[in-house]
Amino acid sequence: YRRQRQMCIRDRNDIQAECVELNFSTCQGHVVELANLLVAYFRKKDYDVKKLKGSINYDFFNKMLTRGKEKGDMVQTAKALIEAIQPLPFYRVLNVNALSLNNAGAYISQELGYALAWGNEYMNQLTDAGIPAATVAKKIKFNFGISSNYFLEIAKFRAARMLWANIVASYHPECLRDCDNKGANGECRCAAKMA
């Protein structure tokens, strides 16, 4: 099984990883292994890691929501995943798949509220485990569903960005690098950007 996955990654010589965002999904039990494979592959191919963007779909809460199953310890897996993907600074590995709420019939306000609570739970548990708030916030990716109500969907995305920035700011994330996007107290504003 592992050999098959390695071959799948190896056979992707025609993909320009620096030009397109790559998003991967795998079994929840193998996300750390996938992260290690990706880091090794990108290093072997001499990619500029600052140009690589993408995600690994690790969503602990979605598994419980859709199947009623809890697999493993979320905090331990998330910490190992964040550590494994550290060489790829623009890869997000903690997903909030609010799409499943939308597909289950949630209204726009319900989807938005639950998604933000979901993201806040990641922030809460992982900052309590000792991971800096700026690091956690930069590793979360939101996947929203889109309904046919055009103007309310636009409003949902704008509200999500604003509300997520407020949630992240409440954790007082410290900027881990020298950037021009610092707040009044050295707060990391780039951590609050939603992907």
What positions do the PLM features span?
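Single conserved hydrophobic/aromatic residue that forms the stacking wall/gate
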Residues: 1-9
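A general secondary-structure signal for short beta-strands and their flanking turns/coil
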Residues: 2, 17, 137-139
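Alpha-helix-loop-beta-strand connector modules within alpha/beta enzyme cores
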Residues: 10-19
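Helix-rich catalytic cores of soluble enzyme domains
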Residues: 22-195
